[in-house]
Structure formats: C-alpha cells, structure tokens
Amino acid sequence: RLMEDKPYYRAALAAQTLHYVPPERRNFFYHVTALDPWPLYSHDIHWMELARIKHEPNSDPIRRTAPLFNIFQSRSEGFATALEELAMHEGLYDDVPRGRELVWIMLANRAARGLASLHVQANEWTLAEAGRFHARWTPRGYSDPDNPLVGFEQLLYLRQPGYGTSYVTGKAELDALIADAAAADEARPAADVLADVFAMLNREGSVPFALYPRRAR
C-alpha cells in the first residue's frame, strides 16, 4: 500500500467519476478513459491532496495556507504524473496488461505538449504550430490539433511558463527523490521505502521537491 487509506480520499476520488464519451466527441483524455479510466484516476491524486488540506491541515502555519504565488506546478503535476506509473509498477494493470500502454501514452502526450510550449514561449512557434507538434507526437492519433483541448492547453502554458513542462520535470524530481531514499537503505523492501516517501510527502505538504528532506545525493 502506497499510503494510508482515508474515508475522505475515497469520497474525493468518487466525485471525479468519469462517463462514457462517444468517439466523435473525444479529446485526448477521453480516448484514454474510453479504454481504461485508471490512468486518469491515478492522476486524480490532486483531489485527494485537496481533501487532505481540508480535513488534515498541515501543522506548519505557513504551509497550511495558500501561498501568494504558484509554487505547486512541478510538485502537484509531477506527483500526479509519477503516480500513474508508480501505480502501474505496484500492480494496478496486472490483470489488464495493455492498460500499461495507456500510462506510457499519457506520459508521451505530456512530453509532446510540454516541449511544444517551450517553443511558443521562445517566440519560435505560433500556437497553431505548437498544436500540430503536440498532436503529431501523441501516440495513436489520440490528439487532434484542431481539438479545443489542444488549443486550450497551449494557451494555458503560454500564460504560465513552466507549467507545460512541469508534469515531466516534476515526475523526474520525484523519481530522483525515491531513488535517493532507496539508495540510502538498500536492505529495505522497495515497497516500504516507497511508502515512507509518500508519508513524507503528506507530512511536509505541497512544497517544491527541492525543499523535501533528502537522505542521499
């Protein structure tokens, strides 16, 4: 078990229940969830974290309240993106092995749209050019450059530089944090190390990964 079960976790996730969307109305995420909703449900750790802030606020008076600026991009999106893969490695798709393909497709989409966003921020590409790159490098044709979601995402990332790449860079930061913890105590079972890292994330609150305690470098 990656983390302790809480009743409010279940309620938060249940509120995000997805519905079937016909093929002609699907954007990237609906193509994925039509086959298996679990990759996106894993990403919905966001809602569980928000519920924890409400039901179990951090003991630190500074970390308990909303900051005056957005520092949560890599921490929140990186954690949610990493959890998609961590849940897979913990056995979520053992009975549906092709579900693993969707986890990798989700990551490929984040990488494509994040890289495209950097070119827009550098004034090298237009939003339309970014959308075409974004769609071209998303597997299976699941992303359409003319779909409103693609335009919305690229405009969002232009307005918030660093956000588009934070899914992948934040995941890499969490992967490194887990690797450091495992290297510091190689005799411990990997599942125990991972559970300790998750407990530390919950205890310390939503702050940039660089501010979390590191057991090894």
At which residue positions do the language-model features occur?
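Long, His/Glu/Asp-enriched segments that create or flank divalent metal/ion-associated functional microenvironments
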Residues: 1-217
